[in-house]
UniProtKB/Swiss-Prot annotation:
Organism of derivation: Petrotoga mobilis (strain DSM 10674 / SJ95)
Site (Transition state stabilizer): 19
Role summary: Reversibly transfers an adenylyl group from ATP to 4'-phosphopantetheine, yielding dephospho-CoA (dPCoA) and pyrophosphate.
Primary localization class, coarse: cytoplasm
Family the entry assigns: Belongs to the bacterial CoaD family.
Subunit structure: Homohexamer.
Catalytic activity: (R)-4'-phosphopantetheine + ATP + H(+) = 3'-dephospho-CoA + diphosphate
Entry's Gene Ontology cellular component terms: cytoplasm
Any one GO BP annotation for this protein: coenzyme A biosynthetic process
Keywords from the UniProt entry: ATP-binding, Coenzyme A biosynthesis, Cytoplasm, Magnesium, Nucleotide-binding, Nucleotidyltransferase, Transferase
Family matches, as Pfam families: CTP_transf_like
Name this polypeptide is given: Phosphopantetheine adenylyltransferase
Pathway(s) this gene product operates in, as recorded in its UniProt entry: Cofactor biosynthesis; coenzyme A biosynthesis; CoA from (R)-pantothenate: step 4/5
InterPro entries per UniProt: Cyt_trans-like, PPAT, Rossmann-like_a/b/a_fold
Length: 162
């Protein structure tokens, strides 16, 4: 843990190739990247926290210096506890920016030493979201362009078992 480490938080419900792209681009700039699977009690998830952690670990297992952890609570408390001063956020569109700017301002007020880095989504992934992928998968649509085989299988198990 230290000044050259960063955190990339998200619900990852499920993890997509867009998330993986942000991780790969982030790890080039930092010594270690903590991918933090967050658990917000006010949010409804398709996958349990343990399932989301399993998918994230599987999809990121070949990327060195990536540490997958989970946290529920205020993100800045996790960052302070770990002594992580850099936060990565991915942006797909202008609509993401408004929300992320509000969150960045709040986080900076709570943790003034925090540097927040916004990475624009690669154009190949700028239009995808976990919600969109879940909807397509729920109709047995092909999501292989956006998620790994492992995640695709987990989606089918979860959504098509009914």
């Amino acid at each position: 843990m230290g000044i050259r480490d960063a955190a990339y938080p998200g619900s990852f419900d499920p993890i997509t190739f867009g998330h993986v792209n942000i991780v790969k681009r982030s790890i080039e700039r930092f010594d270690n990247l903590y991918v933090v699977v967050v658990n917000n009690p006010n949010k409804k998830y398709l996958f349990s926290l343990q399932e989301r952690i399993e998918m994230v670990k599987k999809d990121l297992e070949d990327i060195p210096n990536v540490i997958v952890e989970s946290f529920d609570g205020l993100l800045v408390n996790y960052l302070k506890e770990k002594k992580i001063y850099n936060l990565i956020r991915g942006l797909r569109a202008v609509s993401d920016y408004e929300y992320e700017l509000q969150m960045a301002n709040a986080n900076h007020m709570l943790f003034p030493q925090l540097e927040i880095f916004f990475l624009m989504a690669d154009t190949d992934f700028s239009y995808i979201s976990s919600s969109m992928i879940k909807e397509i998968a729920s109709y047995n649509g092909d999501v292989s362009k956006w998620v790994s085989k492992f995640v695709e299988l987990k989606l089918k198990e979860k959504l098509l078992k009914k």
